[in-house]
Amino acid sequence: MLTVSSITCVRGHKPLFAPVSFSLQAGQALHLEGDNGVGKTSLLRIICGLSPADAGEVLWNGSPLNRQNPEAVDAFRATHCYMGHNLSLKDELTAIENLLFDAQIAGRNLPYDKAMDALQTMGMHHRAHLPLRVLSQGQKRRTALARLSVTEAKLWVLDEPFVALDTQSLDKLRVLLANHVQQGGMLLFTSHQAVELSQPKGHAVDIHPIRLVAA
């Protein structure tokens, strides 16, 4: 379980948002809402250990994620995946190579066929062997989402995953996220639009809103 307890973030001697607390369990999806500039990205980065909090704490399965608990930090790193505005793809590699390379540096064995299936799910199999530098922003995002789908992460933390996608890709993403949650995964995401996650002919995933309020 992920627990966020009274987290605050200060920029220029002023808090970005009021202290925020929530928890996220297996099989749940949380939608982090808030006005532009309120600090949604900053909060996600704090949760993922990419930026420090100015107050409060983040816990994973009851253990605080800080320097005094390196084992808890390592366990959290192994079980979560963050996708921000910077997709962290390598432009000199092809789409399929990006998936295989990411698995390799993470110490995971990703079969070529499984990587190709992930690209096909996101409609990228026809561009699997093209270098990222020639792809559109939407195609790069679909590649990143395909990469996400083959991680072993239980917790997905996604910052605006629905931007730069066409209607067909949005439908594929909704199914991907619904599958993850319904199979016991955890999802925390931001979006400026109303979102529904469901499988074809399946039950919609309950999405719990968390609103970030300016301090």
Predicted regions and their residues:
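Catalytic Walker B motif of ABC-type/P-loop ATPase nucleotide-binding domains
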Residues: 156-160
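Q-loop/switch helix immediately C-terminal to the Walker
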Residues: 86, 91-106
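Hydrophobic anchor residue at the start of the ABC signature
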Residues: 145, 184
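Conserved ABC ATPase signature
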Residues: 131-138
